[in-house]
């Protein structure tokens, strides 16, 4: 967002009007607001069970995405929808059986959504498709024999150490900013657009109109869930070999198929394309055309000149090196620009606040605009306080545990690296959370990349790769989770949910995720060929992050011939596109591509970009035919497509472990 203050004033009236409309449409809402449940009653056993099930399903989905392309869409809206459908369906079923279940409130809905999101966030935020997988032997071998990639600098995945690492690093971020939650949410009135959007959705569910829509949404979800599950099951029968089945269907001909331009019938990515914006989807397609349609064929013509002809193309000193480092250049250019931008916006906003003439003047200026609803939300938010001493004590205790355990797991990580990371955590977390409240951009991954570079360079050649990957994961988790919690607290603020119940839901979800994510990952890791650059499970970000660590150790000497010049060009392109997006009028912004979205196909191929664009096409057509219906049905249908295809991965992995192979291999060859 280019003008955070303008966005804030735009969003707030919309929320207020929606609340007013809700109150008019549902008179019972006013009575419900007067008798809010105590925070302990907002965290229910049925809610935790529902959150665990939703978290498991979404963990499987995002794990599949993280291990194939790495471009994971935001599923918070889908989580809120499924939480509502599950618990509303449960209470209705009990009522029909003659029972009198406790009412299902928007506060319980909010806690369940928070718990489920915290659970599945571990599946992609924990680094299973990036930093943690970058530690394994296959990624070490793919990175090649460079000086920074020293022999033995790998650690094979294991449930024990992965669960231990996640338990050591995933909770502290939830506590670091608890004492500042009132300042960020109430005093500064930060928008946190994603949290606000989720709150508006949940408030809309718990109205008379929302109840009517829920029946249609449930029907749509179940219909497309069943369709997606059956299609995935049907496809499985034709994948009995290498490069077989509908996932290798040469939609645009065999020449295009060789350059990965084909539709692979992945309903997971069709659903993701319906959730992501048209700009994201078209950016991935543009990246696919530039890389697989233009760049890689041109670079391949210099085989034997730019890189040796007698080594496989999957080697880092071959074509794959160009793919990897040009992808990194786009991601780093995009990330650095946003880092500078958000830091500048944050500093400017804080400077303006601290230079106000007096608090009393500000209060008198804004006091007239405060509604009774706002006062009640603020009162509920302040009343559900969590003692600062408890948050500080918890953070300190978790820091001590991490300082002791992480160096035991990884001898390359010195204890003082961990102390520095935890000391910086609250400072970086506040800057990131404040920026996310203004811009809706969570910079946790960028802080993690910077930490990866710094600690890899600091640790040196022998220890740098593992130290950089592990400490980068630690910093990313500390910063990422604190901003996610503030988004959730904003949702709770607007749904009159106690901060205590929100924090409890967040901690429960995180704890569940610390076990579900490693178990799901290890199931996939043992059943499928994870990390094969020529296979389906490419896991591109594992090699990207390992190469970042090597780059931090070696500098530009790690790059293949002419790769530096190309990387500088792509880095500059990423920066300039962002400058153009912020400088151009609003109507032209949609024409400027997103560099990070463009970068993903560089390694994983064009097929997933085509899947995403099919999802965009479905959304576009639906909006043209019936925009009102599409507004509330698209999240349900997209969730059904993603859940059905994603859940099939679970039984298919069990079949693979049991050595049960599909009976048919469907391939396509040129005609005679």
UniProtKB/Swiss-Prot annotation:
Where is it localised? Cell membrane
Q: In which tissues is it expressed?
A: Expressed in root phloem and at low levels in the shoot companion cells.
A single GO molecular function term of this UniProt record: oligopeptide transmembrane transporter activity
Q: Does the keyword Ion transport apply?
A: yes
Gene Ontology CC: plasma membrane
InterPro entries xref list: OPT (IPR004813), YSL-like (IPR045035)
| Chain residue ranges for the region called Disordered | 1-27
| Keywords (A to Z) from UniProt | Cell membrane, Ion transport, Iron, Iron transport, Membrane, Transmembrane, Transmembrane helix, Transport
Where exactly are the transmembrane stretches of this chain? 47-67, 70-90, 115-135, 158-178, 218-238, 279-299, 325-345, 390-410, 418-438, 450-470, 504-524, 556-576, 602-622, 630-650
Induction behaviour = In roots by iron deficiency.
Q: Which GO terms describe its biological process?
A: response to iron ion; seed development
Q: Which family does it belong to?
A: Belongs to the YSL (TC 2.A.67.2) family.
Report the protein's function: Involved in Fe(3+) uptake from the rhizosphere and phloem transport of iron. Plays an important role in iron homeostasis during the early stages of growth. Transports Fe(3+)-phytosiderophore, but not Fe(3+)- or Fe(2+)-nicotianamine. May not transport other chelated metals.
The entry's protein name is Iron-phytosiderophore transporter YSL15
Organism annotation: Oryza sativa subsp. japonica
Protein's gene: YSL15
């Amino acid at each position: 967002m280019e003008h955070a203050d303008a966005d804030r004033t735009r969003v707030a009236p919309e929320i207020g009007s929606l609340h007013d409309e809700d109150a008019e449409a549902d008179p019972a809402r006013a009575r419900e607001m007067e008798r809010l449940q105590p925070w302990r009653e907002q965290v229910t056993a049925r809610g935790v069970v529902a959150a665990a099930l939703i978290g498991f399903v979404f963990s499987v989905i995002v794990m599949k995405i993280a291990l194939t392309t790495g471009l994971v869409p935001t599923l918070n809206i889908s989580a809120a929808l499924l939480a509502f459908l599950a618990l509303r369906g449960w209470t209705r079923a009990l009522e029909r059986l003659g029972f009198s279940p406790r009412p299902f409130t928007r506060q319980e809905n909010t806690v369940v959504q928070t718990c489920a999101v915290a659970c599945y966030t571990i599946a992609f935020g924990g680094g299973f498709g990036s930093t943690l997988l970058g530690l394994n032997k296959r990624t070490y071998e793919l990175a090649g024999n460079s000086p920074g990639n020293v022999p033995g600098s790998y650690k094979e995945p294991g449930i024990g150490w992965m669960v231990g690492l996640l338990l050591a690093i995933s909770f502290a971020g939830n506590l670091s900013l608890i004492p500042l939650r009132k300042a960020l949410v109430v005093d500064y009135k930060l928008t946190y657009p994603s949290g606000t959007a989720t709150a508006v959705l949940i408030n809309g569910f718990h109205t008379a109109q929302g109840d009517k829509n829920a029946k249609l949404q449930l029907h749509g979800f179940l219909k497309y869930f069943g369709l997606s599950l059956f299609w995935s099951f049907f496809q499985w029968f034709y994948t009995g070999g290498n490069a077989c089945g509908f996932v290798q269907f040469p939609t645009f001909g065999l020449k295009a198929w060789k350059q990965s331009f084909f539709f692979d019938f992945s309903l997971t990515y069709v659903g993701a394309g319906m959730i992501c914006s048209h700009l994201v989807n078209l950016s991935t397609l543009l990246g696919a055309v530039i890389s697989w349609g233009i760049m890689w064929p041109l670079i391949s013509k210099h085989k034997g000149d730019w890189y040796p002809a007698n080594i496989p193309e999957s080697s880092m000193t071959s074509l794959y090196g160009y793919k990897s480092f040009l992808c990194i250049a786009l991601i780093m250019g995009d990330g650095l620009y946003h880092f500078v931008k958000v830091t500048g916006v944050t500093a400017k906003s804080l400077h303006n606040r601290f230079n106000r003439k007096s608090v009393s003047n500000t209060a008198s200026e804004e006091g007239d605009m405060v509604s009774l609803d706002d006062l009640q939300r603020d009162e509920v938010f302040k009343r559900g306080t969590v003692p600062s001493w408890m948050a500080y004590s918890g953070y300190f205790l978790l820091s001590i545990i991490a300082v002791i355990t992480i160096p035991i797991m990884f001898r390359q990580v010195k204890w003082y690296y961990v102390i520095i990371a935890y000391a910086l955590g609250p400072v970086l977390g506040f800057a990131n959370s404040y920026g996310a409240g203004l811009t809706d951009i969570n910079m946790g991954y960028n802080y993690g990349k910077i930490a990866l570079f710094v600690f890899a360079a600091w640790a040196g050649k022998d220890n740098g790769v593992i130290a950089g990957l592990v400490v980068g994961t630690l910093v990313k988790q500390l910063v990422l989770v604190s901003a996610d919690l503030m988004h959730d607290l904003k949702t709770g603020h607007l749904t009159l949910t106690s901060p205590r119940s929100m924090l409890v839901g967040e901690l429960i979800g995180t704890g569940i995720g610390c076990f579900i994510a490693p178990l799901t990952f290890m199931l996939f890791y043992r059943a499928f060929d994870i990390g094969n650059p020529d296979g389906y499970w490419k896991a591109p970000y594992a090699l990207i992050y390992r190469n970042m660590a090597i780059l931090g150790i070696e500098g530009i000497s790690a790059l293949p011939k002419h790769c530096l010049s190309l990387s500088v060009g792509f880095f500059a392109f990423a920066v300039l596109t962002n400058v153009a997006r912020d400088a151009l009028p609003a109507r032209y912004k949609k024409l400027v591509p997103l560099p990070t979205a463009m970068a993903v196909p560089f390694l994983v191929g064009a097929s997933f970009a085509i899947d995403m664009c099919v999802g965009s096409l479905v959304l576009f057509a639906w909006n043209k035919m019936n925009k009102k219906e599409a507004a509330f049905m698209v999240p349900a249908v997209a969730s059904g497509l993603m859940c059905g295809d994603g859940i099939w991965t679970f039984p298919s992995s069990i079949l693979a472990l049991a050595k049960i192979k599909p009976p048919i291999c469907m391939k396509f060859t040129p005609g005679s």
